[in-house]
Curated annotation (Swiss-Prot):
HAMAP family: UPF0391. It is a multi-pass membrane protein. It is found in: Cell membrane. This is UPF0391 membrane protein RPC_3278. The chain crosses the membrane at residues 4-24, 30-50. InterPro entries: DUF1328 (IPR009760). GO terms for cellular component: plasma membrane. Keywords: Cell membrane, Membrane, Transmembrane, Transmembrane helix. Belongs to the UPF0391 family. NCBIfam families: PRK13682.1-3, PRK13682.1-4. The keyword Membrane applies. Pfam families: DUF1328.
Amino acid sequence: MLGWVITFLVVALIAGILGFGGIAGASIEIAKIIFFIAVVLFLVSAVVGLARGRNRV
């Protein structure tokens, strides 16, 4: 449990530095880009997984 506390402390410190440091706007844009890339990769992998599942029968 102590490991989780340390992990969340580090995440909170990084978020505070980014939020109060003035680069929050750039971080938001990067997060949006990464989010949409992750959604596209998820959809591609889901379609490929479904296509492979049908051919194995």
